[in-house]
Design a protein with these regions (language model features):
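Single conserved hydrophobic/aromatic residue that forms the stacking wall/gate
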Residues: 1-8, 13
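PRPP-associated nucleotide enzymes
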Residues: 9, 16-274
Length: 274
């Protein structure tokens, strides 16, 4: 569903939690939901806990006690902007500073660039960061920080994130290039050209080319009006979308030995048409 979700005076953005169990519990207590988003469940939990405890920071920390799974949240009240990252740190969340003062939160640093902000640091796994409009201060609440099994989802570097983002000090572009270099070391072949599958496979292909010495070429043109195919409803829809999503540059690949680099295989729908 479209974000953000609003319940009372608290607004939450983005989540992935054990929502179904919590939703049923809240419904049994009289909550009425207006959509199917997990975010609405978190909004209700925070609002309920705040009514009981008074402090929104305490309410959020109490809510985190019962949440399971991956989530990165930005919660806005009348005077505070609050960033929350799940204790395992599955999803990224970062803090930026604005030129005229103030703070901004985003799941990727490239969003900070677009807002004219400067990357300050990442929100740590389990951390609650509060930007207070009254004091102008940034406060850290660390009740859930320090979990030993903290680990970011590897797909953030491989696929989800934009290559111009920096996550936990690591350039996504350079991480993908390095993956391509490792691939060239582990699977060297004789070929005439290295090409990547747009868009997230391009950086890895460039790394493969640099490591192997095989020239890099543009092998596909991507139809920018076709979104991610692996999330579409049926196999037929996915196959049709793949056919019109990518078109080969024949001058690059015709009659040549080609190394084709992609970032990953989820369903494998793209593989056969390519």
């Amino acid at each position: 569903e479209i974000m953000p979700s609003l319940v009372g005076s608290e607004m939450c953005i983005r989540d992935r939690t054990n929502a179904l169990e919590l939703r049923r519990q809240l419904e049994n207590e009289g909550a009425i939901f207006h959509g199917s988003s997990d975010t609405e469940v978190i909004c209700y939990l925070v609002t309920r806990n705040r009514l009981r405890m008074g402090s929104i920071e305490t309410a959020i920390s109490k809510t985190m006690d019962v949440l399971e799974g991956a989530y990165s949240l930005v919660i806005m009240s009348a005077t505070k902007l609050i960033a929350v990252r799940d204790p395992r740190g599955y999803r990224p969340l970062c803090i930026g500073t604005l030129p005229g003062g103030g703070y901004v939160f985003a799941s990727e640093s490239c969003a900070l660039d677009a807002a004219g902000a400067t990357l300050l640091r990442d929100v740590e796994p389990g951390e609650i960061v509060v930007a207070d409009a009254k004091t102008g201060e940034l406060r850290s609440i660390r009740d859930h920080v320090g979990r030993p099994d903290s680990q970011m989802c590897v797909f953030e570097y491989i696929y989800f994130s934009r290559p111009d983002s920096i996550i936990e000090g690591q350039s996504v572009h350079e991480a993908r290039k390095q993956a391509g270099r490792f691939l060239a070391q582990e699977h060297p072949v004789e070929a005439d050209v290295v090409i990547g599958v747009p868009d997230s496979g391009l950086d890895a292909a460039l790394g493969y080319s640099e490591e192997s010495g095989i020239p890099y070429g543009i092998g596909f043109i991507k139809n920018k009006y076709i979104g991610r195919t692996f999330i579409q409803g049926s196999q037929k829809q996915r196959e049709n979308s793949v056919r019109i999503k990518l078109n080969a540059v024949t001058s690059t690949v015709k009659g040549k030995r080609v190394v084709l680099v992609d970032d990953s295989i989820v369903r494998g729908t793209t593989r056969l048409p390519l």
